[in-house]
Amino acid sequence: MLKKDMNIADYDPELFNAIQNETLRQEEHIELIASENYTSPRVMEAQGSQLTNKYAEGYPGKRYYGGCEYVDVVETLAIERAKELFGATYANVQPHSGSQANSAVYMALLKPGDTVLGMNLAHGGHLTHGSPVNFSGKLYNIIPYGIDESGKIDYDEMERLAVEHKPKMMIGGFSAYSGIVDWAKMREIADKIGAYLFVDMAHVAGLIAAGVYPNPVPHAHVVTSTTHKTLAGPRGGVILSAADDEDLYKKLNSAVFPGGQGGPLMHVIAGKAVAFKEALEPEFKVYQQQVVNNAKAMVEVFLERGYKIVSGGTSNHLMLVDLIGRDLTGKEADAALGSANITVNKNSVPNDPRSPFVTSGVRIGTPAITRRGFKEAESKELTGWICDILDDASNPAVIERVKGQVLALCARFPVYG
């Protein structure tokens, strides 16, 4: 018999201390990595439940194991809530990650060697959109599109490349682009050449759910997302469609299971169900609008302090600070800010002369700081501190002063109160 009072602290103090230290780090550091967020205690409760014990290969009502009557309820709740949230007629909540959701789409719609048009990683795309080091770049013929001199997606170039190469699939979505994507324009181009339009909305799914960013679901043949990031749920993936195409839905389901995965993680799917319910609440819309407001406030200060922002601003949750021409690399900026308890990530910028391991930029996002209660005033104050460090990154006195200010601000806005 397993005793209910068994705990990590008594049995495995090394692991317990690591968990406690990470909890403290999250409370005492300002999180500005655009892909990170804080999930709710309700989501964590679901993920720590006995659902982790249950194997459930297959789909609700069509399982390969017995005893699935209650996990069927859990998965059906997640599916129906995801469909309601994004206006879809199909949802698969089983992908373990956004990348696995993306790989399922490739498997369902393409054959190895097929041509795909995807956003250049150096211009803001994602590894799974055709990077040579990723399965997508190794198995498929990738044609990259990018941004123009203004930092906006170049739809003329996209259309020219589409007509020239006639890809079987076009990919929309990004990991480091601060503008609005014209999903309708992309579908128009896809229809012109008879291609599938696949959108990876992982970074902006929460904004889309709240109606503060355009929804790709009505335009794309298939859409994927992570369930964390702006959506603030557990780490995982989801596939959506409103194509009203049962054959497509069957292909997608088969590509997830048995094509790419075995048993789904039912405790994570329960966490997704909770997160989707939270995202349907009115306060979630308020939160997402504040995410965008905070990002715009940060951009305002960066520009005032003389820093270049790729695209010149932001219409979502993130911004890319371009350090080309400054005596500071993205790697150095990342480290200096980290020493002051401000967590960002180094990031390549368009036409970056430095390697992806060094870079000439940093990516900054506002989902996590907004989750802990920051508004425009705190966002602007924080950006001023960031600029102080970037202006004088080798000065330990500046870093120490900002670290003290960060700790005081974190104490005012705890993550979990």
UniProtKB/Swiss-Prot annotation:
InterPro entries documented for this protein: PyrdxlP-dep_Trfase, PyrdxlP-dep_Trfase_major, PyrdxlP-dep_Trfase_small, Ser_HO-MeTrfase, Ser_HO-MeTrfase-like, Ser_HO-MeTrfase_PLP_BS, SHMT-like_dom
Any GO BP: tetrahydrofolate interconversion
PTM annotation (N6-(pyridoxal phosphate)lysine): residues: 229
The keyword Transcription regulation appears for this protein: no
Disulfide bonds: none
Localisation: Cytoplasm
PROSITE patterns for this protein: SHMT
Signal peptide: none
Function statement: Catalyzes the reversible interconversion of serine and glycine with tetrahydrofolate (THF) serving as the one-carbon carrier. This reaction serves as the major source of one-carbon groups required for the biosynthesis of purines, thymidylate, methionine, and other important biomolecules. Also exhibits THF-independent aldolase activity toward beta-hydroxyamino acids, producing glycine and aldehydes, via a retro-aldol mechanism.
Protein name: Serine hydroxymethyltransferase
Organism, as annotated: Shewanella baltica (strain OS223)
